[in-house]
Design a protein with these regions (language model features):
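Ferredoxin-reductase
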Residues: 2-85, 139-141, 164-166
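FNR/FR-type flavoprotein reductase catalytic core
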Residues: 61, 72-226
Length: 226
């Protein structure tokens, strides 16, 4: 089943990331962490569905997305940056394997942060704390960190910011990759479950490393496109 959404507003979150707010159809219910396939209702783009994750659940009258734009790719995300209020998109029913299985370690790369936004917001609203949870968020540069202030203000959440393309980032940001050396310090059973989202190769590598450190596959939550 598909749903038609009307854009209410578009605002900048970072230099290349946009917050899109749509009117929510009453029959579209989305659990935190689930994705939808989104299609632009523009000529030449109606056969270009792409997966995006709402950053809010089924509460309220809107469906919100935070989407990183890649203008150099000349694809759907480049078009996202030019959407205007009143334009329509079409989305599928929600799908996906990423869900809230309780406090744990959230590992995100770039735009892979979006399912965790919804999960962490919902749990904080429900329980009042994110105690026992750690967010490890890797980006190319410090300017790419999405919603940093919001995450740092979340009660009980430990945040670890990593950048890969800057050698001298600002305070509380590490110039480091998520490799075996880094992950060894976090891959402990008491830090499970491990939630992973990001580029496919990154997710595969991290899952493989976690398993090699003795983490059970059942304690790893990731999207499965197989």
């Amino acid at each position: 089943m598909t749903h038609d959404l009307t854009l209410q507003s578009r605002a900048s979150v970072t230099h290349d990331t946009h917050h899109l707010r749509f009117e929510r159809p009453k029959d579209l219910m989305c659990k935190p962490g689930q994705a939808v396939d989104l299609t632009l209702m523009r000529d030449g783009w109606r056969d270009q569905a792409r997966p995006f994750t709402p950053v809010n659940g089924s509460e309220g009258d809107t469906l919100d997305f935070i989407i990183k734009s890649y203008p150099d790719h000349e694809g759907v995300t480049a078009q996202i940056a030019t959407l205007q209020p009143g334009e329509k998109v079409q989305v599928s029913d929600p799908w996906g394997a990423i869900h809230d299985a309780g406090p744990g370690t959230f590992i995100a790369g770039g735009a892979g942060i979006t399912p965790f936004i919804a999960i962490l917001r919902a749990r904080l609203a429900r329980e009042g704390t994110l105690a026992g949870s750690t967010l490890i968020f890797s980006n190319k540069t410090e300017a790419d960190i999405i919603l940093r202030d919001e995450f740092e203000a979340m009660e009980g959440l430990e945040t670890i910011w990593l950048v890969t393309d800057e050698t001298n980032p600002g305070p509380n940001v590490q110039s480091e990759r998520i490799d075996r050396h880094f992950l060894r310090n976090h891959a402990k059973a008491e830090n499970a479950p491990f939630y992973i989202c990001g580029p496919d190769a990154m997710v595969d590598d991290i899952e493989e490393m976690l398993i090699s450190f003795g983490i059970a596959k059942s304690d790893i939550i990731r999207e499965d496109f197989s």
